[in-house]
Regions:
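Nuclease catalytic cores
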Residues: 1-23, 27-42, 55-57, 68, ...
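Structured loop/turn residues at beta-strand edges in well-structured enzyme cores
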Residues: 39-40, 127-128, 156-159, 179, ...
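Conserved catalytic cores of phosphodiester-cleaving nucleases, focusing on short active-site segments
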Residues: 43-144
Length: 324
C-alpha cells in the first residue's frame, strides 16, 4: 500500500514548478462557479499573460475590486461613488479605500458626498488564458473528482482544465473523466510534470451549463451566458493576479524553515508542511521561536512577470489625492 501524498505539499510543489518553468501566474484556491459561485473551488488557477499584461502590471500589484471595474467610473469627470459602484453601502467605503490605496482611483469630497474617478484605463486583453488545475495526487481516493471535472468541462469558464496526479494513470482513469480534461503526472517532491493527455480548448465564448444543486433524483442546472462568464473570468484573473499561491505564514517554531522557492518546510520531519493544520503546540517537534524570514511578494516579483511595486500611470496620477 502506497503512502498517501499530502495534497498541500503536492499543490505547492506544482505551483513552484509552474512558476519556474513558464511565464504563468499560478494562484491557489479560487472560486470556479458563475451561477453558484461558492459551490466550486479550483485548486490552482494559472493566468497566462496576454499582450496587455505589462500595462496591467503597471497599474497595481493587487486585485482591483470588481465593483470598480464593473461600475460606471471613468478617467474623466469624478462621479458619486454611491451611483457608480454597484455594491452594498456598508461595503462601498472599503472598496473605495482599497482602490485608492492601490492607486486605481482618485477620491474627493464635495457637499458631503464621495466622488471618484479612475486614474488610468483598464487594459483589456491582459490575460490570454485561464488554466484550472484540479490536484488529486492519489487517484485511489478520488473524492468528488469526477463531479468537479464534469462541472468545469460543462461550464467552460476556464480555457483549459487539467487533472494533476502523482499516480500512474491508466486507461480506466482516463475513461472516468471528461475527454476535454488534460492530465499531468506530477512528481510530488519536485513538481516536475509529464503530460499524459493534453487538455482541449473549452468554449469560453459560448453559453455554459452549470450544475447548481443536486437532488436524489435530478441535478438542477443553470445556463450561464457568455457575458456572465466573461465577467467572472476577469474577476478570477484579478483575484489570481493579486493573490498568488504563497498564502501562508511560517509558524513561530525553531524547526520552521522556508525553501528557496518559498514553501514552508519542517526540519524536524524533513518535509514541506501545512502550517495551518500541522504546526503548533500539539506537534512533537514544536519549539517556540521566531518564524523564519519570509517575503512572498519579493519571491513572486523575482520569479514571475508580476511586479510588487509598479511605477505605473495609475500610481503617478493618484498622487493628487492620496487620499483625502
Amino acid at each position: 500500500m502506497s503512502v498517501p501524498v499530502p495534497e498541500f505539499a503536492f499543490e505547492l510543489a506544482l505551483c513552484a514548478r509552474l512558476e519556474a518553468t513558464t511565464d504563468w501566474l499560478p494562484a491557489r484556491q479560487l472560486g470556479g462557479g458563475v451561477a453558484a459561485r461558492g459551490r466550486r473551488v479550483v485548486d490552482v488557477c494559472a493566468v497566462v499573460p496576454g499582450p496587455g499584461f505589462d500595462e496591467r502590471a503597471a497599474v497595481a500589484p493587487g486585485e482591483i475590486p470588481a465593483p470598480v471595474l464593473e461600475g460606471s467610473v471613468g478617467v474623466g469627470e469624478a462621479v458619486p461613488a454611491a451611483e457608480a459602484l454597484d455594491c452594498p453601502p456598508e461595503r462601498r467605503e472599503a472598496v473605495v479605500e482599497r482602490a485608492v490605496d492601490l492607486g486605481v482611483l482618485e477620491r474627493e469630497r464635495r457637499g458631503g458626498r464621495t466622488l471618484v474617478r479612475r486614474t488610468t484605463r483598464y487594459p483589456e486583453g491582459w490575460f490570454d488564458r485561464l488554466i484550472a488545475v484540479e490536484n488529486k495526487p492519489d487517484l485511489d481516493r478520488p473524492g468528488d473528482l469526477r463531479r468537479q471535472l464534469r462541472h468545469d468541462a460543462a461550464v467552460g469558464l476556464f480555457d483549459e482544465v487539467v487533472l494533476a496526479t502523482a499516480d500512474h494513470v491508466t486507461g480506466a482513469h482516463l475513461n472516468r473523466i471528461p475527454d476535454a480534461v488534460g492530465v499531468w503526472r506530477v512528481d510530488p517532491a519536485t513538481g516536475e510534470r509529464t503530460v499524459v493527455r493534453d487538455p482541449a480548448a473549452l468554449p469560453v465564448d459560448e453559453p455554459g451549463i452549470e450544475p447548481v444543486a443536486e437532488r436524489p433524483d435530478r441535478t438542477e442546472v443553470a445556463v450561464v451566458a457568455p457575458a456572465e462568464k466573461a465577467q467572472v473570468r476577469r474577476r478570477i484573473a484579478e483575484r489570481a493576479y493579486g493573490k498568488g499561491w504563497r498564502t501562508y505564514d511560517p509558524p513561530p517554531c525553531a524547526s520552521a524553515a522556508v525553501t528557496d522557492d518559498g514553501r514552508p518546510r519542517c526540519t524536524h520531519f524533513d518535509r514541506v508542511v501545512d502550517p495551518a493544520t500541522e504546526c503548533g503546540r500539539d506537534c512533537p517537534g514544536f519549539e517556540r521561536d521566531a518564524p523564519p524570514d519570509f517575503d512572498p511578494a519579493a519571491l513572486r516579483d523575482a520569479r514571475t512577470p508580476w511586479g510588487a511595486d509598479p511605477e505605473g500611470a495609475g500610481r503617478r496620477q493618484a498622487g493628487l489625492d492620496r487620499f483625502g
